[in-house]
Amino acid sequence: NVIAPINKERLESELGIRFRAFGTGWRYDWQSDGMLARVVRPDGKEVSFAYDALGRRIRKSFAGTTTHFVWDGNVPLHEWAETAESEESEMVTWLFEQDTFVPAAKLVANGECFSIISDYLGTPLQAYDKQGNKVWEQELDIYGRQRKRPSAFIPFKYQGQYEDAETGLYYNRFRYYDPNAGGYISQDPIGLAGGNPTLYGYVEDPNVLVDILGLTG
């Protein structure tokens, strides 16, 4: 499996990441159970993660802000952020189509609500407010990379994936997907028994298949 080189210009323009002169890259630190514990970015800033006993991510911390997550089975239900000054953002509730990982709506504690329109694969394409105004849209290429950089208003990508703007990775329940490389940053937890000789690959054909838990690839 070939890992694509880092596109520094894209990361700098879209994520605001600046590279050190001596070329320091990304650093990944892992827990003993194989879950990603921390990312040190090329600019030296750290992003840390915490998980519950089932391996579901419950916290993400970056630059003095911690985002908390509450789950409904294997899909996120609530999220909210708080800063070091104890300021909390409005809680967001995510609704999904029944028994799927396809997001259907975003509800904000202040009363705002938005409907989410997805394609045949369950990938969100657009979001609309109560008045029917389009407030967000995205278009992904075959690897899940965004053709145009939208806001993080709706963080979901391929079905089961949640984008972390701080790292450019997509959290995929049991693994993290790198859209720039077109694969996962860690091996399949069951190794070669998963039937993927690369150990890091995504699904065979992303035009018709999805990996909702990060275990199918």
Task: Mark where each language-model region is.
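Compositionally biased, low-complexity segments of secreted and virulence-associated proteins
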Residues: V210, G214-G217
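A conserved catalytic-core signature of glycosyltransferases
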Residues: M91, Y171-N172, P197-T198
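Short glycine/serine/proline-enriched coil/turn segments at secondary-structure junctions
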Residues: S86-E87, A165-G168, A193-G194
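Short beta-strand-alpha-helix junction that forms the catalytic/metal-binding core
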Residues: N196-E204
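Short, conserved catalytic or interaction motifs in soluble domains
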Residues: R41, K130, P179, L192
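A motif-centric feature for acidic-aromatic and gly/ser/thr-rich catalytic loops and repeats
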Residues: R10-L11, K106, N110-F174, N180, ...
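Acidic/glycine-rich beta-solenoid
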Residues: N1-F114, N133-V135, D141, K148-K157
